[in-house]
Amino acid sequence: MKKEMLAMILAGGQGSRLGVFTKRIAKPAVSFGGKYRIIDFVLSNCSNSGIDTVGVLTQYRPLILNSHIGMGSHWDLDRINGGVYVLQPFMNEKEGNWYNGTAHAIYQNMDFVDTYNPEYVLILSGDHIYKMDYSKMLKFHKEKGSKATIAVIEVPWDEASRFGIMNTNEDSSIYEFEEKPSEPKSNLASMGVYIFDWKMLRNYFKEAEKNPEINYDDFGKNLIPKMLEDNVGMYAYPFKGYWRDVGTIQSLWDANMDIIKSPETLDLADPKWKIYTNTMAMPPQYIGKNANVHRSMIADGCRILGEVGNSVLSHGVVVGKGSKVIDSVIMPNVVIGENVTIEKAMIGECATINDNVQIKNVNNEINVVSEYENIEPRCVLIEGGL
């Protein structure tokens, strides 16, 4: 069945800068905000934008991510005509390779896209936190007569050299793309959100297929510069909302803190734009008689007998008597014993922090504890990780 636009979510990245949190799972499957996994945001954006056909391109350690997505029913994507499809690298009669880059991942799945013969294809990163109506971006794409539209967001000038920067004319047309420029001319950073006319993009892939010397493996490094060289009509779509690339431990911690310290920046309670997830069947949270909880997100299944402040606790977390959890992100099913102090830390899934452990914030560095780690009683962790 022909679709006007389908979405392809790039979700195969390892996320090596997240260190211990991606040892066993893909970056888009990392827990966020007490209740969610990172990929929930783009899946919810697709559903809320009226996009009913979504391909999720996985590669690195996909088991938990695949299980989380399932049939897509939690995002209303279990459709007869459309739905969500998990697409992994595969072999055919000629070749079989891992995805070599963002564009190569789409190229390998041309047959899937052709099944729906869309006018447009929406390319998304599965590891960013934001809420966006893609139908508005598509409207912009049509109004401009664009062949390729890239969503951009203004970043602080002193941070612009960390991003792929789009240099634009007054009409928002893009005349130059610079990857992490040392002296940026603009502060419009690419969000990794693209709309392409499918026939045009497909023609580029077919050109590379015929000529082994042509490399279109990556959108930012290869394909977008080539399109600009060919004077393809390319426009920058300005996005004004909250957006964060949670590619590092610091940025992941910052984004979690944003939802408790400035909840208006990323309103998770907005009834008009809900963020859906594959929820766990767990009892309500329990707050003990002598517990003290302030400015925190506490998920279902938590049992709080101590103090929790300025923190995000995922489902199934236990905080024992006399324990304090301050300025921290605690991932699912962590058990914290009695008389424990945890300050400015990120604790991985299913870790056990035994009685009288001290995890202290000394130099304002984030303390990190690996998933499934067992911290022995009376250990002291200062400015570091396990």
Curated annotation (Swiss-Prot):
Example GO BP: glycogen biosynthetic process
Record's keyword terms, sorted: ATP-binding, Carbohydrate metabolism, Glycogen biosynthesis, Glycogen metabolism, Nucleotide-binding, Nucleotidyltransferase, Transferase
Keyword Nucleotidyltransferase (UniProt): yes
UniProt-listed Enzyme Commission number(s): 2.7.7.27
Pathway entry: Glycan biosynthesis; glycogen biosynthesis
Database matches in InterPro entries: ADP-Glc_PPase, ADP_Glu_pyroP_CS, GlgC_bac, GlmU/GlgC-like_hexapep, NTP_transferase_dom, Nucleotide-diphossugar_trans, Trimer_LpxA-like_sf
GO molecular function: ATP binding; glucose-1-phosphate adenylyltransferase activity
Keyword Transmembrane helix on entry: no
Enzyme class: transferase
Reaction catalysed by this enzyme: alpha-D-glucose 1-phosphate + ATP + H(+) = ADP-alpha-D-glucose + diphosphate
Residues that, per the record, bind alpha-D-glucose 1-phosphate: 99, 164, 179-180, 190
HAMAP family: GlgC
Subunit structure: Homotetramer.
Job description of the protein: Involved in the biosynthesis of ADP-glucose, a building block required for the elongation reactions to produce glycogen. Catalyzes the reaction between ATP and alpha-D-glucose 1-phosphate (G1P) to produce pyrophosphate and ADP-Glc.
Stated family: Belongs to the bacterial/plant glucose-1-phosphate adenylyltransferase family.
Protein name: Glucose-1-phosphate adenylyltransferase
Source species: Clostridioides difficile (strain 630) (Peptoclostridium difficile)
Underlying gene: glgC
